[in-house]
């Protein structure tokens, strides 16, 4: 008659049937011939078949991804030892009391059943911010401030959009308004990168340019690890400014392309093949800085007297 009737405690837990057809259309429990029909207090009732929220699926998918061809276990112990835990969980603030909470609960339940190795599924958790409309408000069709990324890609290219998003600000925890002037600036920068080969010189490269490249590699590598993509992009821009002024060697040019590749994958692929390379730039080793080249020849030390800066000493 449509009444909701709770299952008596003595009948808990309600176990699911094992002879379900998982390949049927719709909900397998709905298609089962007998399971959903039962009695409570001698009254015939129909069990609820919509039993699992979609958050249940997203609470353990990573355990299956690492061993998705295993037909004996949902996730083997060896696969979990090789891959788990998830290094970093990125999500919005709304996940804190929703998906994050559910997936941690699910992991602890699986741990209690002896099916997983760790009590916690994630090593670290970071909030990511929102891209706001040009007016500084959350994008909304009703406000007319929605930026369509597909339209932007068609207008200025995927690399420009990707690199502009990286340049907007620190990735973690902040919101940033879309700025058409900002994305135009990134587009101009990539056009300069496209023409950087014109500044490759046959002569010996200027020492300061070589030093700056190795410093840039250090900075970009460190910033990527700390999710500070905006300052990594800034360092790349500073290097291009220097290279355009002094010229750069072919080796430095190739190192720079490999360094830029994660930020502008399509442009760097084209530039890489233009050098006569037979393999993708994305199959190459990431550039490594030489500390002896990157090291400063002079160090400035502040001199303090009674806690106040009184001067500086420069040592070579």
Q: Which stretches of residues belong to each language-model region?
A:
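Acidic, turn-prone loop/beta-hairpin segments
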Residues: 2-9, 13, 132-133, 203-219, ...
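Structured secondary-structure scaffolds
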Residues: 1-201, 212-241, 251-260
């Amino acid at each position: 008659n449509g009444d909701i009737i709770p299952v008596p405690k003595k009948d808990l837990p309600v176990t699911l049937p094992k002879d379900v057809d998982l390949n049927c259309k719709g909900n397998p429990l709905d298609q089962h011939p007998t399971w959903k029909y039962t009695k409570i207090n001698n009254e015939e009732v129909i069990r609820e078949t919509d039993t699992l929220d979609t958050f249940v699926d997203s609470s353990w998918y990573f355990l299956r991804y690492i061993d998705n061809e295993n037909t004996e276990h949902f996730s083997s112990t060896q696969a979990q030892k090789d891959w788990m835990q998830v290094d970093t969980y990125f999500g919005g603030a709304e996940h804190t009391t929703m998906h994050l909470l559910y997936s941690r609960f699910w992991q602890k339940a699986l741990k209690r059943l002896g099916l997983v190795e760790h009590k916690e599924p994630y090593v670290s958790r970071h909030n990511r911010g929102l891209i706001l409309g040009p007016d500084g408000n959350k994008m909304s069709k009703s406000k007319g401030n929605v930026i369509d990324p597909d339209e932007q890609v068609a207008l200025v290219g995927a690399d420009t959009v990707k690199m502009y998003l990286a340049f907007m600000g620190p990735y973690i925890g902040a919101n940033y308004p879309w700025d058409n002037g900002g994305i135009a600036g990134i587009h101009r920068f990539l056009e300069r990168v496209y023409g950087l080969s014109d500044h490759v010189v046959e002569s010996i490269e200027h020492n300061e340019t070589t030093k700056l490249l190795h410093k840039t590699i250090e900075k970009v590598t460190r910033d990527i690890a700390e999710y500070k993509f905006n300052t990594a992009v800034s360092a790349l821009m500073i290097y291009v400014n220097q290279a355009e002024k002094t010229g750069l060697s072919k080796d430095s040019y190739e190192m720079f392309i490999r360094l830029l590749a994660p930020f502008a994958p399509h442009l760097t692929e084209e530039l890489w093949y233009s050098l006569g390379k037979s393999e993708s730039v994305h199959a190459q080793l990431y550039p490594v800085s030489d500390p002896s080249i990157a090291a400063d020849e002079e160090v400035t030390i502040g001199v303090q007297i009674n806690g106040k800066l009184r001067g500086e000493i420069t040592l070579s």
